[in-house]
């Protein structure tokens, strides 16, 4: 074979191997597009529509049908264990948490986390209160009414299913309770603590009473039962709902908090939802009835739709699924 012929053959073989090594030139543009799409997804903020006062199986199923990707459950301790219970009165009692968690675990593709709103660091003392409700801080660790028992239930049913857990403490003095102290010392994978209040006060509590809780497990919430009351215009320095949540979002950006949630949006309050998502930059919103357990109704469905529709229109947000990791 002549030298020139050999050279031509060698160059031809080299050209044939280039697509195998570096990819075809025709594939480069689609590959660039995929990278751009992946980058955009990472930059979008995961968003949560959190169904309010889910106390039974019906509430779980209906919330999922409405598009909820997280559930807020009010919980109270009884001698026989933990129950979904909003105000510790006979009419508000729902399912046992053991039964409810089993239902939720099966819906792990839809539910990213469960927010356990602890009602019993404070005791209900009125005449109408259920005297069977116990103070978990006074229960021994091996008793079913203890905080350890509650945590074990979440780890038995929710953790294996990949459903995250948020332990919510509503009042400032709850952070000085034995229940709070136990949880902060025993936080595990997929678990976080939420404190309710103004941004600077929440941070103060986390730094003092909750110093063992890492920033990646700190969550703040703020709101009102009637969202329009004290909402503000989002431009105040603080003291109003939107402004305080906006302050919380700034702390999140600094790395002091992991998530910031607002509450509670009802039907017809879409303009407030828009401001919470667009101006306050919250991570999620509790929605639903103000004082009634969750169930299928045009009002719960519409209030869920307010959140979901706004997220769909946004280029900077997406609705979370059970596959997303919050903390």
From Swiss-Prot:
Species of origin reads Paracoccidioides brasiliensis (strain Pb03)
Q: What is known of its domains?
A: The SMD-tail motif is highly conserved and may be responsible for structural stabilization.
Q: Read off the InterPro entries from this record.
A: PLC-like_Pdiesterase_TIM-brl
- Give the cofactor note: Binds 1 Mg(2+) ion per subunit.
Q: Where is the signal peptide?
A: 1-23
Query: Keywords of this protein's UniProt record, alphabetized?
Result: Hydrolase, Lipid degradation, Lipid metabolism, Magnesium, Metal-binding, Secreted, Signal, Virulence
Per the Swiss-Prot or TrEMBL annotation, the motif SMD-tail is positioned at 320-327
Q: Where is the active site?
A: 52
Q: What is this protein called?
A: Sphingomyelinase D
**Tagged with keyword Magnesium:** yes
Instruction: Write out the similarity annotation.
Output: Belongs to the sphingomyelinase D/phospholipase D family.
Top-level EC class? hydrolase
The cofactor(s) it depends on are: Mg(2+)
Listed binding positions for Mg(2+) are 72, 74, 117
> What reaction is this protein's catalytic activity?
a sphingomyelin + H2O = an N-acylsphing-4-enine 1-phosphate + choline + H(+)
